[in-house]
């Protein structure tokens, strides 16, 4: 892009990255990372799917024009975003979008569920233990004390939900503390959490 490095606060795209090949998507994400200021945000909205797209559908130009053939699994999508350096990824929303059924798409061996995902990738420094990915998980402490401190920077107040990243959810769950509830991913996140 003919844009200076570290010069943009927010960049956004809607369904554009889904029409790229994996190599082109990686290059586009690298460029977005380059032009964003530190703590700048890349807001994305793309179709994703829960499985690898069959080659016959991946190479279908009609589906590419519909922004469907480039859909990849959410974890792969997040990995592509974090592989260029984004230290924080927030899944803001995820909802059903389309179904590619074998009846209508002969290249599909089974129904392929396509979902629309809204993501905010933040140009934060990459934590030593990997990126902070927020998928809408929360932790609630309901023990006998006023709070629970995991000594890793997370303080859970008595009976107050706290938005946490998936990495923190995993670490809290590993404590096997029967007084801490960890929710499943809601795939809705509007900020205010900790990693």
Mark where each language-model region is.
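A short SAM/SAH-binding and catalytic strip from SAM-dependent methyltransferases
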Residues: 9-24
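A short glycine-rich, Lys/Arg-flanked "PGG" loop and its adjoining helix->strand segment in the class I
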Residues: 26-41
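A short acidic, Gly/Pro-enriched loop at the edge of an enzyme's catalytic core
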Residues: 1-11
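C-terminal lobe and adjacent flexible extensions of AdoMet/dcAdoMet transferase-like proteins
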Residues: 84-96, 100-195
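Short "lid" loop at the C-terminus of a central beta-strand within the Rossmann-like core
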Residues: 16-17, 47-51, 93-98
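Class I S-adenosylmethionine-dependent transferase superfamily signal
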Residues: 15, 31-33, 81
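Short alpha-helix
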Residues: 69-91
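Short, glycine-/aromatic-enriched active-site segment of Class I SAM-dependent methyltransferases
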Residues: 47-68
